[in-house]
């Protein structure tokens, strides 16, 4: 019986409960979907999800961020004004910094998989308890790369 104990499934169940208790739909849905995949024949798709899930998530996030431009909610005039407003210039600089950190984070997570568990725990805790969003592992890994010099 103990040989069939699946710690990873227990972790996903705990995350599901944390998501429900904190009323965080992202964590609840993600954990629920992964549990269903894990306990069904769909688990054969885990290698594909692991290989492409991050890129797909970034693609969906980018589509969401660019939608106000495509829909016209953010006018061309507003976009042009962003290059002359101090606040917008600072926002552009911060956006550049965060994108750079995310790139460093992807490289670090690929080259040092031993840090991934800690980054994921911190991110999930931040999402579940602090109402954050799950883009944290990339930025956290980017910040970590600055501290450890990678």
From Swiss-Prot:
Pfam families: DUF441 (PF04284). It comes from the Bacteria. GO terms for cellular component: plasma membrane. Its main location: membrane. The keyword Membrane applies. It comes from Acinetobacter baumannii (strain SDF). The chain crosses the membrane at residues 1-21, 45-65, 83-103, 115-135. Belongs to the UPF0756 family. The lineage of its organism: Bacteria, Pseudomonadati, Pseudomonadota, Gammaproteobacteria, Moraxellales. Keywords: Cell membrane, Membrane, Transmembrane, Transmembrane helix. It is found in: Cell membrane. This is UPF0756 membrane protein ABSDF1616. It is a multi-pass membrane protein. InterPro entries: UPF0756_TM.
